[in-house]
Amino acid sequence: MEVAAKYKGARLSAQKARLVADQVRGKAVEDALNILTFSPKKAAVVIKKALESAIANAEHNEGLDVDDLRVSTVMVDEGPTLKRIKARAKGRADRIFKRTCHITVKVADK
């Protein structure tokens, strides 16, 4: 049985989030939580939150045992980009892209 949780509109780029997602994909839930807890990256906090939500969904909604769960899928998709303007010298302006992403974490029993 596969159970999912989604985190939409996370304020970090999909490229940076994928670096962390690759570290936990396929691991046991307990190992994945340890990796995310001690990772210094901002994406680790966001992915950990989604993983904890998926674990809670599996335990509460499906009645699965937490010790038997593993991270089956971690998908990071690009979300909408917020476009901002930064004033520069001599009346010029630069564009600033504030990127967002959608994170989907699926856990399954072994």
From Swiss-Prot:
> Which named protein is this?
Large ribosomal subunit protein uL22
What CDD domains does the record tag this protein with?
Answer: Ribosomal_L22
User: What GO molecular function annotation could you give as one example from this UniProt entry?
Assistant: structural constituent of ribosome
Quaternary structure (record): Part of the 50S ribosomal subunit.
Q: Which SUPFAM superfamilies match?
A: Ribosomal protein L22
The role this protein plays is: This protein binds specifically to 23S rRNA; its binding is stimulated by other ribosomal proteins, e.g. L4, L17, and L20. It is important during the early stages of 50S assembly. It makes multiple contacts with different domains of the 23S rRNA in the assembled 50S subunit and ribosome. The globular domain of the protein is located near the polypeptide exit tunnel on the outside of the subunit, while an extended beta-hairpin is found that lines the wall of the exit tunnel in the center of the 70S ribosome.
Identify the domain of life. Bacteria
Q: What is the lineage of its organism?
A: Bacteria, Pseudomonadati, Pseudomonadota, Gammaproteobacteria, Pseudomonadales
Organism of origin is: Marinobacter nauticus (strain ATCC 700491 / DSM 11845 / VT8)
Q: State the UniProt keywords alphabetically.
A: Ribonucleoprotein, Ribosomal protein, RNA-binding, rRNA-binding
Stated family? Belongs to the universal ribosomal protein uL22 family.
GO CC, sorted alphabetically, is:
cytosolic large ribosomal subunit
* Transmembrane annotation, as ranges: none
